Amino acid sequence: MRHKKQELKSSFLVTPYIKRLLMSHITGLSTAQLLAEPNLQLTEEQQIWMDNAICRLGNNEPLQHVLGYSEFYGHRFKCDGRALVPRPETEELVEWILNDWSTLNSQLSTLNLLDIGTGTGCIALSLAKELTNSTVTALDISEEALSLAKENAKLLEVENVDFIKGDILNKTFNSQLSTFNLIVSNPPYV
């Protein structure tokens, strides 16, 4: 009975759009190609993956964790249970910083930026990729999140980021805050 309940719950969660995303991921075909081939048959291995993905969605696992990635500011970030999923509206924060930096650029020779609670590294890495003359420090209290952010730095070929495990509330770290000319954070919703 619980299995049938789970199947029913999953069927409501998997909209045609989400199904196309899953199908595109597993087949490597674009959405347009999938629409052009409505009778596409999955291999047995692909069908097993698809069934597992739908089950995971039914268990309230985020789509980005099921797919293993999230798109953010034009880049693909590895995404899994080690950090929360980057929120689309956070891209506006990155855009705002980049726009303001172009104004401040004449006043400061280099940007020394701190990203507090870096998670996947989406803010720190997106800014570091755009502001190549900057020094970016990505801080997180979670070793697991930092390991994910480091993997994303490697995938995106970003080298101007230092990763630090630490607690911003720690007095020792607090004394170092004055070395940064920009501090950014987009903590999880409470």
Annotate the PLM regions.
Residues M1, L98-N112, N160, T172-N181:
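Intrinsic disorder/low-complexity segments
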Residues G28-L29, A83, Y189-V190:
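Active-site/binding-pocket entry motifs
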